[in-house]
Amino acid sequence: MNDNTEPDFSLIIASAVHDMKNSLGMLLHSVDSMCDELPEEWRKKPNVATVQYEAERVNSYLVQLLGLYRLQNKLLSLHIDEYYLQDLLDEQAAHYTQIFQSKNIDLSISVERNLTWFFDREIILGVLNNALNNASRYTKSNIEITAKIDGKFLLIEIHDDGKGYPEKLLAAPPGEILNDINFNTGSTSLGIYFAAMVTKLHVQGDLHGHIKLSNGGRLGGGVFSIYLP
């Protein structure tokens, strides 16, 4: 008997994205290893940083697409554990050392002493990775990451000294941000939508995780805020 059932194209795409993400991860690891072996003056070359930055950006998009597919199909589950924020943010910052140095961007981290919190590490790292990618793209010369307790929430913020978020983006609810996709300007806002969807999976009682976009902050530019209950 012939099976005429059409294949699920979204599943095919998800499988392809998963394979591409793994391959790109290996490529990123190889690039980092090669950069470690380069003379100091070569590491700061713009072309080296561009390869790292663009590869990280593509990898971030693939992670988001795969995460949203799993979320839509109820396949995304949280793996909650307790983490030290200082260690987590230091690790993430180290990942961007070469990129920031080549762009003459100063990165600082301010965390409340001995601050720990419960959350899904991989999901939050994905959100932070996208926020740092965006900040490095639009900042002038400074980025600051802060983490503190804000009421019943852990508040992580990424501040930059760029021009800030457009008013249209600030006015749109994060969950509806994809309505403003503009392929002509390269603004898909996929990262913001992904962050909004996955942070709200973090629930404590009647409190839900969420994000907030604002301007001003500690450096006068854009502020990307992550609230986790």
Which residues does each PLM region occupy?
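Conserved C-terminal segment of the DHp
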Residues: 26-41
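Glycine-rich ATP-binding loops of the HATPase_c
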Residues: 200-217
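Short alpha-helical segment of the dimerization/phosphotransfer core of two-component systems
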Residues: 53-61
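Conserved micro-motifs of the catalytic ATP-binding
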Residues: 73-78, 116-119
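Glycine-rich/acidic phosphate-handling loop/turn and adjacent ATP-lid/helix
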Residues: 159-186
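Conserved catalytic submotifs in the C-terminal HATPase_c
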Residues: 81, 106-115
